Amino acid sequence: RSAAFVLSAALAGQTLATGFVPQNVQAAQEGTQESTTETGKLIDMKAAIEPVKASYGYYVDVYQTNTSANLTPESNASIGVLSKMLDIFTPGDDWNTGTVLDQTTHQANLDKVKEITANRTEEEKTRAYLDDRRNQNYSMTEGLGGYAQTFIDGAEGQTSITDTIPEDATTVKYDDAYGDNAPWANTDGTYGNIAKLVNTIRGGAASTSSAKKYYKYMRPFRWSRLNGEYPQTTIISSLKPQEKADPSNDGGYPSGHTNGANLAAIAMAYAVPQQYSQMMLRSSELGNSRIVAGMHSCLDVIGGRMMSTAIAAANLNAEDNAAVKAKAVADGQKLVETVGAASDYESYQKDKETYLYRMTYNLKLDNADTTKEMVVPKGAEVLLETRFPYLSADERRYVLYTTGISSGYSVLDDAEGWGRLNLFEASNGYGAFATDVTVDMDAEKG
């Protein structure tokens, strides 16, 4: 059974009710689509979702430039997508010789770290330790919620880092045995194709090393030790053995753990879209735990999310990955059917606010321009491909356009728009109706 109705553009700017998921939404594509904003500005909606090319090109086309041989924003897409940091900080020749250009934002960034670390609870310290020491792929399985244990059992997911912190962790470094040296999951096991997709995306020109080497923005505890000029913050005692003795090869921006976690989360969300929002929330939790740990600043974590979002989209667009994507989705739906669990949206509003806060940490200058139009990166629509399989590519771009956050936040206004994508919100459908939208409700599709 199906039914069609039209939603007027008069609803433009109105947030959709929680839980509303449009089925087979088809925006009229004939001629120029226009919508009037609250300020009376007429928008050409077709033009609004056109991608904008950055100095390095389009990320999804040039993502493989992220190598150690390319160390400029123009030659390396990952360095380029993070380049709004250059409004705040100019890298020096050495790890501690850079120049702070925007003292207000830099100070606010470190003040926020001090605030978070000064108020960390024992539970938060334990979470920060586990998120630091465990393979991020394994950590992200928690975002699968009611499907997590069945997935772990079937894919033989494993970690050697137990839930209890060893008493000697303050002096002994514990590494996850199932990280770099052994598989975190069996890609040939039940649901193994989900693990394979995670590995594929994390292995696709995804390293933060070149960006760290270029920006040379110190970790917060090192800023604390610089002439006593900045807020004093410390690493949690159980992670003290993880501090590298050589600071010259240990930059903070962007956060590698955040990058890895978000890549794994997006891969799992692609395979199990029923858990999309929860996967994004778990990813943001791990990023936040890097600040709780004292290992990273807010800007580091924000950069890790931005970069990984672009990397994930690039790998999901790559033709060579089509087969592993399809198999992962098949395994994901087999997992859902086997468990028969339902997603928990009881805390939607709270989770929405938490995720939004962690996107920005409210780092924004008082005179920042908050009126820039949203930009949707080329290829970003693939991130919602399985969440909204009944929408066209352009329609998924509209979803991203209407759920993006406002401009003006520190480092987030990159040329292509990766920093402003709010995947938690986007996974819940249109943020507003920017044009007349025809909805074809098909009961067979839920």
For every predicted segment, state its role.
Residues 1-12:
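Sec-dependent N-terminal signal peptides
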Residues 13-30:
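Sec-dependent signal peptide cleavage junction
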Residues 29-292, 337, 354-446:
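Hydrophobic alpha-helical bundle signature of multipass membrane enzymes
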Residues 257-261, 292-321:
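Alpha-helical transmembrane segments that form the membrane-embedded catalytic/substrate-binding core
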Residues 325:
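Active-site- or binding-pocket-proximal scaffold segments within functional domains
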Residues 328-343:
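Extended charged low-complexity segments that act as oligomerization/scaffolding linkers
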Residues 344-351, 355-357:
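A conserved mid-domain beta-alpha-beta active-site/ligand-binding segment of alpha/beta enzyme cores
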